[in-house]
Amino acid sequence: MALAPPITEIEQLKAHPALGRLLEWNTAAVQAVKFDRDELTIWVAKEAICEACLALRDAAECPFNYLCDITCVDWNPSEPRFEVVYHLLSIPHKERVRLKVRLGGDSPAVESVTSVWPSANFYEREVFDLFGVRFAGHPNLKRILMPDDWEGHPLRKDYPVEGYR
């Protein structure tokens, strides 16, 4: 059986609880959407990520009350180079959504969501440690996996295979 093609039109996906809530909250913050293999991905403006997470967490009809993970993708040499990815779950409604924020440049930064989900603390530290993404407002942004004196961020595509010497 062939897979259905991805849906990328916002109008076709407005009925999804996460997208509907974000469009109700701030239409301009939603940059793009993709529904593929029963999973919804929403690209959000980096300036609005904290408020978007808060809007989804506090949504009355379908609260996305659990932050499963935060990770990052390095698309080097493309620009914007980085995407920070937030995986959210609505436990009572068994719905999932993925939020993505595009970040450019050699010193990527985005607002921390630790004020929305305290569990974001270690996820953000891991992304900082391995990719070098800074999270503004993070209560304790320091390395979590690599030694404190480690040079660079080893999951960046421009990181030397043999490490810095």
Report each predicted region and the residues it spans:
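Terminal low-complexity/charged segments
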Residues: 1-165
